[in-house]
């Protein structure tokens, strides 16, 4: 499985690089994100396999109630990384370089305009004002959510003693 995942990730890596060799000197945002997602999947699989070898299930693991935070933490973290890949490839940080507001608004008005929600704006994101605003907003919002989850995780982790195996 590892070799297959690595081969797929490498193949998409070449597809991603090839997308930047033709009309423009940068790669396609979606191809970059697919390559990044495959890399995250490969890394996660390798980490999971390593942990299964180092800590067999019979041994168990210490528990103090933080387990309920791990799934949301991992999901939002991976979402944040994927949105970061789209942001990087689409160069949306150039459009909204300021923080915490985006050109004076928390939620840019272009996102709330129903007429902007077209496939064309997602496909041709370089000519669109909608896609950079949406991706930047989602990336920032998921970062805020990630901070809340990490704080909840840390409060839970440090407020209870670890029970023995």
Model-predicted segments: where are they?
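Polytopic transmembrane helical bundles with strong interfacial aromatic enrichment
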Residues: 1-165
């Amino acid at each position: 499985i590892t070799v297959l995942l690595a081969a797929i990730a490498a193949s998409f890596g070449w597809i991603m690089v090839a997308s930047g060799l033709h009309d423009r000197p940068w790669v396609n945002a979606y191809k970059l994100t697919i390559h990044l997602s495959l890399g995250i999947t490969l890394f996660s699989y390798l980490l999971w396999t390593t942990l299964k070898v180092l800590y067999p299930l019979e041994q168990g693991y210490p528990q103090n109630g933080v387990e309920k935070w791990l799934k949301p933490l991992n999901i939002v973290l991976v979402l944040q990384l994927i949105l970061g890949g789209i942001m990087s490839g689409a160069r949306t940080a150039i459009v909204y370089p300021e923080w915490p507001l985006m050109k004076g608004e928390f939620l840019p008005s272009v996102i709330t305009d129903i007429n902007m929600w077209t496939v064309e704006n997602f496909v041709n994101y370089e000519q669109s004002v909608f896609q950079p605003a949406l991706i930047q907003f989602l990336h920032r919002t998921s970062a805020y959510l990630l901070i809340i989850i990490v704080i909840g995780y840390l409060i839970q982790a440090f407020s209870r003693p670890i029970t023995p195996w």
